[in-house]
């Protein structure tokens, strides 16, 4: 038995050459934790609560979104979809300045996106949304003829998701391309602070 039953943090510490790790009881939170360093409650990689619920506070997981409309996007040009804000970025792996996720470790990542498009020109040849990664690109494409739009212009919502292999340092983002037609499409942004108000967003998390 480790500990005397009183309110205290107890741990087993692994003293490495450059990095220490611990397995211990964070008494103030009533959690069994595994993490880096010697101080419980900080840099926790894995935590088990009294109900057996497991949390991973440092697991890469981001939900980024476009905060405002991008209007009259140029056709015949690849346009990186802006993701300048986020609801959460659990391990600080998403750059809201360049709209790019960078994998912190090698693994399999689930990447999904939803893009709202308005004022699509029915005379365009096709449009596409892509998940662009260092190891390959994955696209959803369509053309106005498949929609038989009753009016010109028209709008559409696109969802895409893929599990991809990423090495540490690999990147991922979403982009949009329209072939032909006029430069009039708008990429919807989020004009509210609620999840329900989002029109274009991206989520990424480490699966394994």
Predicted regions, residues:
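Extracellular beta-strand solenoids
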Residues: 2, 14, 34, 48-50, ...
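Short small/polar-residue motifs
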Residues: 17-22, 44-45, 89-93, 98
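Self-maturation zones of extracellular/virion spikes and adhesins
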Residues: 1-43, 60, 66-72, 124, ...
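Extracellular jelly-roll beta-sandwich "head" domains, especially the C-terminal globular C1q domain
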Residues: 51-208
């Amino acid at each position: 038995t480790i500990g005397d039953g009183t309110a205290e943090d107890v741990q087993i510490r692994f003293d490495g050459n450059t990095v220490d790790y611990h397995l211990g009881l964070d008494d103030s939170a009533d959690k069994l934790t595994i993490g880096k360093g010697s101080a419980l409650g900080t840099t926790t990689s894995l935590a088990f609560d009294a109900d057996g619920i497991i949390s991973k506070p440092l697991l890469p997981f981001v939900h980024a979104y476009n905060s405002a409309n991008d209007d009259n996007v140029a056709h015949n040009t690849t346009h990186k979809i802006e993701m300048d804000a986020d609801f959460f970025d659990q391990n600080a792996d998403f750059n809201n300045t360049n709209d790019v996720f960078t994998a912190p470790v090698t693994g399999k990542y689930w990447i999904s996106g939803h893009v709202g498009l308005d004022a699509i020109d029915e005379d365009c040849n096709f449009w596409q949304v892509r998940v662009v990664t260092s190891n390959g690109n994955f696209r959803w494409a369509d053309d106005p003829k498949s929609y038989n739009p009753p009016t010109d212009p028209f709008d559409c919502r696109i969802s895409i998701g893929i599990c991809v292999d990423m090495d540490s340092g690999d990147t991922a983002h979403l982009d949009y391309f329209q072939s032909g037609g006029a430069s009039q499409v708008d990429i919807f942004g989020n004009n509210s602070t609620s999840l329900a108000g989002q029109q274009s967003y991206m989520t990424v998390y480490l699966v394994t």
